[in-house]
Amino acid sequence: SCFRREAGSYGKDTKGILRVHQFDKVEMFSFVKPEDSGQEHEFILSIEEKLMHALGIPYRVLQICTGDLGVQAANKYDIEAWLPGQPSSTGSGRGTYRETHSTSNDTEFQSRRLSIKYKNPATGKNEPVHTLNGTTFAIGRMIIAIMENCQQADGTIKIPPALEGYIR
């Protein structure tokens, strides 16, 4: 479980399960040599995209500008799922994209503080690894995305084929 400090105390998402104080998510972590971190970051993003494709949820990928990155991240992507039932972010019509995943390349920020190192075979020295993380699914938000994108005319929800084997 994760906890959000401000949790519905202000802003536009104070009702429902879109933005709650306590939420669950499945996260991926990688520890790699510095020269491999760029490629690993793209690999984590590709896993997140494959999952969205498997569910048939429309989405977009945003590369976050440096001014919006947290102090630890050197590069970050967000995946936003299309939520057709939400009010439009432009104020006209229905539907908007909302973040369901992110992946960050934190380079040495965390490993230096935690003293996580590997022995560099070229130098024989212990050097900091690069750390990366990516959200596989933010559970509540993915439930919203599935419900809104898979609702049938009669109000029922058609479970995506990729999940059918897990539902009884």
What does each model-identified segment do?
Residues 1-168:
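TRNA-recognition modules of translation machinery and tRNA-sensing kinases, especially anticodon-binding
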